[in-house]
């Protein structure tokens, strides 16, 4: 066997490999000999079929299987001998001339093929004992518990009919009957009866609610609005519509009394119990924010201390996924790059930097996990599946079946578990100081930070 490296540029390598026909033919004959006792052919006693006859019957298919196995084993030896860790699947280029292929399968021609790879660079890990990170912690105050309960009360506040002759104002709930038309023709889904709408909630298409301010009970108005260009129903998107709209009831929001009775409407036995439950929920929420801030700071330190050029193919794959998602989000929101005060080229440059960071950090975390034997157990994955199932009441079996039949989905569950375990490993070694902060500081967004 001859191996010639035809390309070595950075992390990219290409090899041309030549395997003698005699070597392949010997492997084919060995495999055929192993079939003698298993194959049953008319005219031959069990185990007495000559290899030459087996070769006539099964030679081509066995040769194809042998070639596939030989190429796989040869490539693996080449990569292992050179200490290569592949960034992605090797690209094998086989002969295309049919006569040459036939000759190889018949054991008369040497097999010559090429393989192109991109490898993961050697990664020198930092000394994590030198890392210093700050853990931001916020206590849940009584006022924050009360504010959270008040927000729930505001969302569930009762409404009462306004006095006769009163007009609708922002915040009022108006019950409507309407008929919609486009170019004078009614359209599916354009009519409704007894439809409640809180003015200012922006729950109808833009411009609809504004034209209802000041309407009275029994009053009819023709509301003229265009459907958004990114509207979900494509046959309506961007079209001008008219809605003949009548207000049948106008109600004003009432102050909710926050007491034991209010707590019971939420399924809690008393206001004190509601406060306990809210404090627990906020405590978990704050702990989650603390964890995210700490993790972000740690990833930033890993980014600063591990500078290397990651495999271009991995960065391209990550960028393509991100770019596709960005375009889908912008299209859904009906926005352009100009709306975000940037250009497409500037956005591409920025997101390619983020893709580079994500790939590098992923490789660093993987290296840390490998060197310190950090793994994700089946029990940990099962717990993650159970948690997903709990989030979808009534569909638990569907969730279990989905993960049982989708290895890719299971891998997506493993990835964040592995990442968190590696982060915990580093935090055990790093110097972590704790700082008390307010809720506002804990949840403050850091827009200048790159997405991790």
From Swiss-Prot:
The keyword Oxidoreductase appears for this protein: no
GO molecular function: peptidyl-prolyl cis-trans isomerase activity; protein folding chaperone; ribosome binding
Segments traversing the membrane: none
GO BP, one annotated term: 'de novo' cotranslational protein folding
InterPro entries to which the protein is assigned, alphabetical: PPIase_dom_sf, PPIase_FKBP_dom, Trig_fac, Trigger_fac_C, Trigger_fac_C_sf, Trigger_fac_ribosome-bd_bac, Trigger_fac_ribosome-bd_sf, Trigger_fact/SurA_dom_sf
Domain PPIase FKBP-type residues, every copy: 171-256
Protein name: Trigger factor
Species in which this protein is naturally found: Afipia carboxidovorans (strain ATCC 49405 / DSM 1227 / KCTC 32145 / OM5) (Oligotropha carboxidovorans)
């Amino acid at each position: 066997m001859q191996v010639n490296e035809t390309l070595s540029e950075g992390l990219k390598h290409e090899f041309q490999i030549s395997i003698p026909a005699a070597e392949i033919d010997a492997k084919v004959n060995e495999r055929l000999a192993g079939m003698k006792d298993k194959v049953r052919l008319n005219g031959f006693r069990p185990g007495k079929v000559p290899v030459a006859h087996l070769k006539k019957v099964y030679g081509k298919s066995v040769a194809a299987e042998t070639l596939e196995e030989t190429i796989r084993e040869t490539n693996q030896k080449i990569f292992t001998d050179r200490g290569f860790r592949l960034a992605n699947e090797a690209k094998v280029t086989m002969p295309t001339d049919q006569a040459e292929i036939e000759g190889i399968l018949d054991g008369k021609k040497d097999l010559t093929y090429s393989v192109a790879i991109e490898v993961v660079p050697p990664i020198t890990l930092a000394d994590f004992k030198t890392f210093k990170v700050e853990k931001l912690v916020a206590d849940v105050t009584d006022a924050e518990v009360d504010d959270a309960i008040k927000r729930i009360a505001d969302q569930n506040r009762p409404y009462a009919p306004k006095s006769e002759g009163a007009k609708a104002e922002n915040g009022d709930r108006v019950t409507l009957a309407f008929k919609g038309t486009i170019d004078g023709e009614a359209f599916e889904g354009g009519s409704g009866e007894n439809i409640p709408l809180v003015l200012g909630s922006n729950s109808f298409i833009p411009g609809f609610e504004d034209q209802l301010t000041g309407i009275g009970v029994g009053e009819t108005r023709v509301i003229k609005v265009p459907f958004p260009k990114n509207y979900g129903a494509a046959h309506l998107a961007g079209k001008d519509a008219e809605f003949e709209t009548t207000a049948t009831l106008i109600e004003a929001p009432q102050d909710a009394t926050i007491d034991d009775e209010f707590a019971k409407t939420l399924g809690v036995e008393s206001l004190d119990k509601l406060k306990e439950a809210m404090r627990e929920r906020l405590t978990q929420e704050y702990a989650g924010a603390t964890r995210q801030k700490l993790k972000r700071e740690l990833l930033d330190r890993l980014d600063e201390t591990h500078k290397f050029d990651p495999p271009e193919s991995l960065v391209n794959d990550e960028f393509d996924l991100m770019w596709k998602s960005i375009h889908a989000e912008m299209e859904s929101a009906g926005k352009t790059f100009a709306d975000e005060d940037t250009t497409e080229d500037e956005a591409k440059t920025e997101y390619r930097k983020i893709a580079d960071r994500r790939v590098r950090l992923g490789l660093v975390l993987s290296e840390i996990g490998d060197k310190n034997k950090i793994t994700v157990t089946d029990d940990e994955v099962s717990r993650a599946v159970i948690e997903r199932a709990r989030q979808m009441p009534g569909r638990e079996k569907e969730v279990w079946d989905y993960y049982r039949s989708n290895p890719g989905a299971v891998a997506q569950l493993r990835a964040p578990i592995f990442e968190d375990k590696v982060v915990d490993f580093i935090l055990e070694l790093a110097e972590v100081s704790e700082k008390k902060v307010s809720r506002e500081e804990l949840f403050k967004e850091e827009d200048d930070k790159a997405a991790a």
